[in-house]
Structures are given as structure tokens and as C-alpha cells.
């Protein structure tokens, strides 16, 4: 769904664990990392799109997560000119996103990047809460800063345990 201003309706998903960390995923075959996100289909609510994208991108079902909150309004970013497909109609100049903060209720092993058969991501890890703001591709940075600021009090209040000392291989950064 592309609106009259050229922005595609999209949902963004931030998954947090009991340590106050967030899931950070690497785009398939690329060196860029981001939160899961995806388009809202015609006739689909933002929440329905979030659950669909959650399964398609990271293999999680509604029973694996709890919705903590969502953004009060849609947040927008423009695509760099080199990424705008001028030959498509209507032309999409960026994304308008409704963001959801989810708490993971299941074990990390429930995360499956290949659940849809067309993986969006090829790796993931837990990172400190503010890490993504510094690391995301530049044209998404302002939206990430806004959403992380809006969600900070809620996300960080759900930290129920200290991060364990490293024992063996762990997927953590930041």
C-alpha cells in the first residue's frame, strides 16, 4: 500500500529479551543489519502485518511474544534517490512505519530465519538497547532514534535479569 505522498505502509518490529537486549538481524547476503520490518498488505491491520512479518522473517508466532507497546504515530523515512524505482507505479519514495515492541516469551531456539523459505536475514544476535541507532543504515537512523526513544522506558523496565557472564559462544553485541 503506497499512499498519495509516495510512502509505503510498513511495520517495524523490535524484539527484546529479559536482559533488556534487542534482536538485531543481518540482511541476507549483505553486510547491513536492521530490525525485522515489512509491508502492510491491502485490507490488513498493522498488527496483522506485524504477526505475518514476524513469522516470515524470524519464524516466531504470536504465542512466542507479547506486545508491550506500539508507536503512537507512523514514522517516515525517505529512500535515497538511488534506491527509488522510478519505473514502478505508483513510485515509492520511502516508508511510513508503525513500530511494535515485543517481549520474547520463548527460548531463543524458537527463532528461525528460514521459516518462510525466502529468508530476509542470514544471521542475528542480541545487542544492547541503543546499539542499533548507531549501526543502522544512515537513511533509517532518524526513525530508529525516534522509535527507540519512544520505547526506552517500556523496554528497559522489562529487564528482569542481568546478562550472564560469557560462557562459551553467545550471540551478543554492543
UniProtKB/Swiss-Prot annotation:
Question: What residue stretches are annotated with the Nudix hydrolase domain?
Answer: 6-149
Motif stretch (Nudix box): 38-59
Cross-referenced Pfam families, in alphabetical order?
NUDIX
**GO-annotated biological processes:** mRNA catabolic process
Cofactor(s) needed by this chain: a divalent metal cation
* SUPFAM superfamilies given in the database record: Nudix
Entry-linked InterPro entries: Nudix_hydrolase (IPR020476), NUDIX_hydrolase-like_dom_sf (IPR015797), NUDIX_hydrolase_CS (IPR020084), NUDIX_hydrolase_dom (IPR000086), RppH (IPR022927)
> Which GO-annotated molecular functions does the record name?
mRNA 5'-diphosphatase activity
Keywords in alphabetical order:
Hydrolase
Cellular component GO terms held in the UniProt record: cytoplasm
- In short, the EC number is 3.6.1.-
Q: Give the family per the record.
A: Belongs to the Nudix hydrolase family. RppH subfamily.
State what this protein does. Accelerates the degradation of transcripts by removing pyrophosphate from the 5'-end of triphosphorylated RNA, leading to a more labile monophosphorylated state that can stimulate subsequent ribonuclease cleavage.
Q: Write the protein's name.
A: RNA pyrophosphohydrolase
Could you tell me which species this protein originates from? Shewanella sp. (strain W3-18-1)
Designated gene of the protein? rppH
Amino acid at each position: 500500500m503506497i499512499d498519495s505522498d509516495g510512502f509505503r505502509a510498513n511495520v517495524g518490529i523490535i524484539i527484546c529479551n529479559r536482559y533488556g537486549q534487542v534482536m538485531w538481524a543481518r540482511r541476507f547476503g549483505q553486510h547491513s543489519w536492521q530490525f525485522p520490518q515489512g509491508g502492510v498488505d491491502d485490507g490488513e491491520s498493522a498488527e496483522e502485518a506485524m504477526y505475518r512479518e514476524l513469522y516470515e522473517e524470524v519464524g516466531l508466532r504470536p504465542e512466542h511474544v507479547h506486545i508491550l507497546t506500539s508507536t503512537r504515530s507512523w514514522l517516515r523515512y525517505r529512500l535515497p534517490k538511488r534506491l527509488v524505482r522510478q519505473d514502478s507505479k505508483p513510485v515509492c519514495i520511502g516508508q511510513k512505519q508503525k513500530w511494535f515492541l515485543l517481549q520474547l516469551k520463548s527460548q531463543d531456539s524458537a527463532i528461525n530465519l528460514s521459516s518462510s523459505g525466502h529468508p530476509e536475514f542470514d544471521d542475528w544476535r542480541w545487542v544492547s538497547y541503543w546499539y542499533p541507532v548507531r549501526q543502522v543504515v544512515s537513511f533509517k537512523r532518524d526513525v530508529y532514534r525516534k522509535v527507540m526513544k519512544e520505547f526506552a522506558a517500556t523496554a528497559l523496565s522489562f529487564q528482569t535479569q542481568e546478562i550472564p557472564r560469557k560462557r562459551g559462544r553467545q550471540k551478543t553485541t554492543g
